[in-house]
């Protein structure tokens, strides 16, 4: 290992980037796999449509091995980590706007499909950064942090933010919003939070 690589590995503590990297890895997967079903159910979509489309948009995580070998041909792993995080945030913002559209379901599914490709690409790049930036010993040392923050993303998304959508729904309903409008408003706020 050359001196430059060794210095870059020692310059920034893994505790400063491993937790956020794996939290960001877990969030799109959990939102598309679990939270989107609650969102669509609240907005009146049938169970059959929800099951079909949410399972279909999860395919990028299954087939990500197809484009994994080509990522470093174009740019670095770090580039793809940053780019996919920004792209996913922007797309969640678009989804927040899409729930207000007349054909919101089709548009939101389309946006979520792009989030899925972005999230799957982020998974590939994030694992690559983890392996290339950390020594074998450090990889073993921080594997617990990796898993903890990936699972924290699950807890925040499925527990905290789904609860928050329900809390907002109650508030919007209390001020006279119709049921559908109250759900649209509450999910707009939650999807906007996923932007950050």
Describe these PLM feature segments:
Residues 23, 91, 103-122:
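Hydrophobic core of transmembrane alpha-helices in multi-pass small-molecule transporters
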Residues 69-74, 96-97, 156-184:
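Transmembrane alpha-helix termini and helix-breaking/packing motifs in multi-pass membrane transporters
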Residues 47-48, 134-146:
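Loop-to-transmembrane helix entry/capping segments in MFS-fold secondary transporters
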Residues 60-64, 140-166:
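Glycine-rich segments within core transmembrane alpha-helices of 12-TM secondary carriers
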Residues 82-104:
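C-terminal ends and interior cores of transmembrane alpha-helices
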Residues 4-61:
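Helix-loop boundary and gating motifs at the non-cytosolic
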């Amino acid at each position: 290992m050359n001196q430059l690589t060794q210095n870059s590995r020692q310059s920034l503590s893994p505790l400063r980037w491993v937790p956020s990297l794996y939290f960001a890895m877990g969030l799109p997967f959990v939102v598309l796999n679990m939270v989107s079903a609650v969102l669509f159910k609240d907005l009146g979509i049938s169970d059959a449509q929800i099951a079909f489309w949410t399972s279909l948009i999860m395919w990028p995580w299954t087939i990500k091995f197809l484009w994994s070998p080509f990522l470093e041909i174009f740019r670095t792993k770090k580039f793809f980590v940053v780019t996919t995080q920004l792209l996913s945030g922007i797309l969640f913002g678009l989804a927040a706007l899409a729930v207000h559209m007349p054909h919101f379901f089709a548009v939101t599914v389309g946006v979520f499909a792009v989030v899925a490709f972005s999230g799957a690409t982020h998974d590939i790049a994030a694992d690559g950064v983890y392996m290339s930036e950390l020594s074998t010993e450090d990889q073993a040392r921080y594997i617990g942090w990796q898993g903890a923050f990936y699972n924290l993303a699950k807890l925040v998304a499925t527990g905290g933010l789904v609860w928050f959508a329900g809390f907002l729904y109650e508030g919007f309903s209390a001020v006279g919003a119709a049921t559908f409008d109250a759900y649209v408003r509450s999910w707009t706020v939650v999807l906007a939070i996923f932007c950050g």
